[in-house]
Amino acid sequence: MPPEPAYSFTIPSVEDDTTLECRIYHPAGLGKTLLHHNTNSLRGAIFAHPYAPLGGSYDDPVVLPVAAMLVETGYVVGTFNFRGAGGSHGKTSWTGKGEVEDYCSVVGVVMHYLRTLQHSARQGSELLSPVMSADERNVSGAKGSHGERPLSILLGGYSYGSLVLARLPPIQAMQQRFEEATMGTAAAEIVQRARTLAKQTLKAVEDERQHDLKASRERGAIPEDAPSSPVRHGRTFPVLIGGEETDSADRRRSRDTPRSMDLVRKSVDFPKRLKAHMRHGSALQEGHPLSEGDKCHPPTGIGGGGDGSSPLLVNAHYLLVSPVLLPLTTNIAPPGPPAPQLGLRGRSADSKAGALFLQHATLAIFGTNDTFTSNRRLRAWATKTEREAARNFEWQAVEGAGHFWREEGAVQKLRERVTKWVETLR
């Protein structure tokens, strides 16, 4: 039985403001984590569904158990419907470019949701109003501290979702995009939505704590000044949130803004910028100073530290379930350079589209009876990638499992292997 989502809500895609359906799931111990200010244990995950025209959605029978497993292991999990899937607006694109941007949009909302939870807990659980002040729109909410662990984000996808995953830019590039968001744009709206959700969570945790404290005092079980831990008291899930955070007078559609054209240009230029972004990410994570050429411009929008606060440090990990390697899938594959990490033809000697899987902890898992890609080709790709990635890449071929994991015991084996890998990321 999959868990109930804490929130079901919508966000605009940073591609063209297409409305996307999203869910956020909470692990059981989230309230306790926030009350005890143990925010170093906060982890986020996003998992993408299969091809929408073939029935893919966030209710997919593989997506749901994988999401449930991640929740059980302590992740705050985000799932979503790509454009054209479920209740999301728009249509599935022929190039996949829109789906890549849809995924980036969900990365933004999950990342800033966790960022707000982190900051508020570190400030002594001083809960903020769900309505943003004007000052808060213009400053960052996360001030770094020495010894602060990077936020762990797991990015995953199943089948077509893994193809989209393979075309994502580095996590630091996505992070910068939201930190520099201009008020009224889709990216800014996503940051606002993330903060509103986080503040609602913090308020719910505090309300439950006060409820427990009052009930215990009335029973005489504890003294007046004793602490209490939160438990759920009949709260109905999920909380449904739609509409927009930004005042309609301030809201600017991405397709109407000069910035949207700049973002398209950046997407086209991504292969040339990949190495620079990876150097930037490595320097941030390892504490190395950046060269002048690698430094990002100071954020000026609502999402990041234009007030002098330190940037949010993020570590990315990747999970590919039943990756699709057949050349026949190029018609539905996302845009960009050929994906050598997925074994597609036309590999360029200079193409590094698979570098993210080589540089970050990655697990690929597939069945030996996959009908979309032969077991021989999957094993050859996985073996080669493992060799190139040294210790960062792991893979598992589940005997007898097909692409849809419908065989007896197949989903359980999938869950067990992913759980084992996730435990190594702590």
Write out the residue ranges for each language-model feature.
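Histidine-bearing beta->alpha loop at or near hydrolase active sites
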Residues: A85, W395-F404
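The serine-hydrolase catalytic nucleophile loop
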Residues: G55-P65, N375-R376
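Conserved alpha/beta-hydrolase
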Residues: P65-H89
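Alpha/beta-hydrolase active-site loop
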Residues: T92-G144, Q172-A221, V231, R235-G243, ...
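Catalytic histidine-centered segment of alpha/beta-hydrolase-like enzymes
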Residues: L54, G90, A401-K413
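Short beta-strand/loop motif that positions the catalytic acidic residue
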Residues: L358, A364-F366, D370
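N-terminal cap/lid segment of alpha/beta-hydrolase-fold proteins
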Residues: M1-G44
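Gly/Ala-rich beta-loop-alpha elbow adjacent to hydrolase catalytic centers
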Residues: L155-L165
